[in-house]
Amino acid sequence: MAAKDVKFGNDARVKMLKGVNVLADAVKVTLGPKGRNVILDKSFGAPTITKDGVSVAREIELEDKFENMGAQMVKEVASKANDAAGDGTTTATVLAQAIVNEGLKAVAAGMNPMDLKRGIDKAVSAVVSELKNLSKPCETAKEIEQVGTISANSDSIVGQLISQAMEKVGKEGVITVEDGTGLEDELDVVEGMQFDRGYLSPYFINKPETATVELDNPYLLLVDKKISNIRELLPVLEGVAKAGKPLLIIAEDVEGEALATLVVNTMRGIVKVAAVKAPGFGDRRKAMLQDIAILTAGTVISEEIGMELEKATLEDLGQAKRVVINKDNTTIIDGIGDEAQIKGRVAQIRQQIEESTSDYDKEKLQERVAKLAGGVAVIKVGAATEVEMKEKKDRVDDALHATRAAVEEGIVAGGGVALVRAAAKVAASLKGDNEEQNVGIKLALRAMEAPLRQIVTNSGEEASVVASAVKNGEGNFGYNAGTEQYGDMIEMGILDPTKVTRSALQFAASVAGLMITTECMVTDLPKDDKADLGAAGMGGMGGMM
């Protein structure tokens, strides 16, 4: 086992804080409508230019191992915020930095770290409740557009496209982001169905650059059982090969000899095949297979109704215009199913939703309606260069996640105002169990001004002046850094999804609290390569003597 380097107390915290500040300072320049870009060097190809906080955070690795531990913990904040809400990564980083800096000052002054942490947790819990009270539902197309615009760094075209996409496929529908071919952003709505099952073998991949399987005008074989014997599949494979079309097999599972033979056939180019597991489990799987059958005008091959896979013909297979499969999802686009039958199936599922008493069942049934009736909207991102395309795709992706979060939990005033208002409301009444908890509460509430201050700093104004003016206002009154005007943030269209603001605060406080209570840090001692080389040389000399 390698020897370890151990640091205690203030020595450890100073190093950790340095790492926190390096990472947070790099990330926070991207915050707000006038946030700057960060250029990331890549080991191959052109550098990436981004305004996406989590992309910047992921690139940072520090040489000093103790500093790097601090940086990695803040990186965790950005990643968690990104996973939970898809946006708010920079806000979360700024909050974490503010809480850690304030907290470590208090620890250095002799406060008890555990009580400080309890105070911070109390403040965060109270502010989260207050944010829920301030939250308004996000329902109109205009509000959805505004949320999308803000999250795409004030790009109103992206906001409009997301709003239109949600209007076309419904708020539950599937919206994907792809590279466009021109300079303009476009919205393409395709009828289709997506489910969360990826390819059963990476050898099916025929588009290595995107690690996807794409099948044009494929047949679809739907089977309600495991397939392990290739003999059962031969009649269908021969029929499909003669027809010269690709085949997608959706079954409970494809394994052993059957899967191996399909892979070999695909690699030799004899027949273009892909296999995925059927979505869902038990009765839900049967229902979803039936949904796919109706969408593609196919038949589910099921032994329950006396059908045998060996006797299946091309007439039993469904058809679609295109199928795209990645490691996690399968999307069936433009099935040839009869419109009247699809509508009948949707009506039947809606009836089940009304009769269902379980929230979970209702949610799953609602998903099936969305997949049958909604279709897939594709936002095609246009740009002049590949570097710009990557940067823009990141922003569109963020905006899409933020909009979904807004529809889910509602919206609050943006620009850091909601946190300032919630903190002010809580400050009046919240008290800790002792004086040190009160200090924790105060420092957490003070740190909640950090996003507002950073947005103002990035726009080139004086943060203290603007923060003071906003604190003296009421309700949604705030500062629009894009136009440099004060006013009602919601009327000006500066909105943040409640979920994004809440997640950013909770994750930031969680990790910051752990860092404040750190007393010891342990890492590997760096290896002394020179000493090793010296020893090897001496050994050689010994042999010569």
Swiss-Prot record:
GO terms for molecular function: ATP binding; ATP-dependent protein folding chaperone; isomerase activity; unfolded protein binding. GO terms for cellular component: cytoplasm. Pfam families: Cpn60_TCP1. GO terms for biological process: protein refolding. Disulfide bonds: none annotated. Its main location: cytoplasm. Forms a cylinder of 14 subunits composed of two heptameric rings stacked back-to-back. Interacts with the co-chaperonin GroES. Together with its co-chaperonin GroES, plays an essential role in assisting protein folding. The GroEL-GroES system forms a nano-cage that allows encapsulation of the non-native substrate proteins and provides a physical environment optimized to promote and accelerate protein folding. This is Chaperonin GroEL. The lineage of its organism: Bacteria, Pseudomonadati, Pseudomonadota, Gammaproteobacteria, Pasteurellales.
